[in-house]
Amino acid sequence: GFLKIAAAAAMSGVTAGALSACNAASGSTASSAASSEAASTAAALTYTPGTYEATAKGIESDVKVSVTFSKDKIEDIVIDVSGETKGIGADIGDKMKENILSAQTCSVDGVSGATITSNAVKTAVADCMSQASGTTVTVSVDVEANEEPDVITVTSQEDADAVVVGCGAAGIMAALELQAAGVKTILLEKGSSCGVSNGSVAGGPALAETRVQAAENATVSVETLFNCEYGFSKGTVNGALLHKCVSAGERVVSNFMDNGVNMGLRRDAYGMGFRARHNFADLQGTQVKGTDRFQPLVDKFTADGGVFEVCREAVKPVMDGDKVVGVIAKDTENKTYIQYNAKAVLIATGGYAGNQDRLHEHFGNINVWPLCNELSDGKGYDIVIEAGGIADRNWALCCNEFGGVNGKMEERGRSMVRSNDTLRFAIYGGLMVDPNGDRFMNEQYLADRPLALGGEMSLRVGKYYAVVDQTMYEECRDKGVLAYFGNPADWYVGSTGYTKELLPNLDEHMDIAIQRGWAVKGSLADCAKAFGLTDLEQTVADYNAACAAGKDEQFYKNSYLLRELTGDTFYVIEYEPSIWGTFGGVKTDSYARAVNAEQQPIQGLYVAGVDNGSIYASPYYENEGAALGTAYTSGIVAADCMISDLENA
């Protein structure tokens, strides 16, 4: 419907553009109404006094609650969310306890950014209420709202020189640089802390010419890293902007290490010929993640005079003609709207992994399972488009390099990764088929370049299947995949990554996969029938002929990964794509300024990280750490450009 915007303070002629849809976090109107109804129902219950326990599945663990009742009241709750994502679900116990005790019901608003964990807490409390009352208690779970209300009332305004939307890899770097340069900056984060973004938990960035590399005599030159990434892109990215990003590597390291967050250097996992990927290992070798990684940077930012606000979901730009002069954000806890006025706005909201509609729009109606947080729902992209921006051409996904997943699994999110030994066959280089039972790729791409090339190929079919005979099953379980293929010296990934890998839990895990319907065991014909793989038997026959000949005439996979599949017993495992993040966003110039359809910069609007569609290739760069490295460095580059523009305004 027609959007109306009411402002508590005069907007001085400044207008706000039309509201675009968003995936709001927990706490919708429907949820609030249900909470009121449930509270009335709960008030009518009587309980058998005592303490009751229950569990419910969270995003990474079983959430456990212990609820103590008197005859007519919930007296106390102990909530254990320690196994949930640090900085997100693991931090909500006290808030959920407060909400439930105050309302005396399980149907309360959840915590923004931790919807799945919130729902698990409520479900477990409902179980305890049912036990104590002898009455079945149902819970109103939070759902993702699709739209903001037609009428937005701006209840307050804040002023700054710059507003950075998103405390992820790009946002935190930009905020640090801006405030250090004396630019009064407000940093907004949709989640409940600085430790919820992918940038705060991802393994490590690919960077060039850093002190960390120099200390190990392993310096990667800007030229080497740039040529790798720009060459891979075939010129489809903004080369000038990418070069600026690649050149900013040491500044990323400085921002971390000078503020007490140690960094190290990873091995060359995929045979790139250089060691660009860093890590965040502390001096004891433990990888630092979440708030432990980002809080020292936020502390520096605020010590310099910056303002950091959480639970702020940006929903629309503030326009003055064609210029962006601010952003309106929703306080997701209090359900109010705040207008942030600024001379420069940076959008760095982390992509669209939490927006299934957008994933389907670009990749078809297939299941793509996010392993990352799902707060990033494409809202940043929408804001730029509303301000007059346009999309760039490269849309891609950063796929799971640790194996396959399937939606029939009980686990969700990051806990899906390596939770079952059968998932590993997806990247072992053996026979893979599509839903017709046909080969559809050179399986070595998925083994050697799973983040980019192999992952891209899996998107073409939606579901893909590993075909394993009894010999492969047993040898991979007991000896490892490297031994199964005869320890080929030419297989770099195998000889460096799989030398010690066995599958000790494969029997138990295969039984689970079969029970849940994403794997089958039997004759080849039985396996084909179970998944409707009509061409499977002929495909295996053709594949075996290629193995016997020592030459793959279809996809030319290296002969050392060709081994016949024989015998009476087979296993077929069904996989679906899973992702760490998304690529594809708005077009910018080489100064990270959003551009309009005439290719002219939109004054006051900048874009960094994966929201910037001009610095990421499709498929994703083949060197590991490129996504995170480019996100961090693009925040610095955007800040440099913002500072220059503000000085010259």
Q: Where in the sequence are the language-model features?
A:
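N-terminal secretory signal peptides and thylakoid transit peptides that target proteins
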Residues: G1-G13, G17-A21
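Active-site- and interface-proximal helix/loop "cap" or "latch" segments in soluble metabolic
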Residues: A44-D142
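A glycine-rich dinucleotide-binding beta-alpha-beta segment and adjacent secondary-structure elements
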Residues: V78, K316, T534-P619
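Beta1/beta-strand and adjacent pyrophosphate-binding region of the FAD-binding site
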Residues: I152-G168
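Core beta-strand elements of the Rossmann-like FAD/NAD(P) dinucleotide-binding domain
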Residues: E158-A160, K335-A344
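Conserved redox-cofactor binding core of oxidoreductases
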Residues: S247-T336, Q356-D357, G404, C547-G567
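Glycine-rich loop(s) and the adjacent beta-strand/alpha-helix scaffold that form part
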Residues: Y340-K408, L628, V637
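An anion/pyrophosphate-binding glycine-rich loop and adjacent beta-alpha core
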Residues: Y381-I383, I390-A530
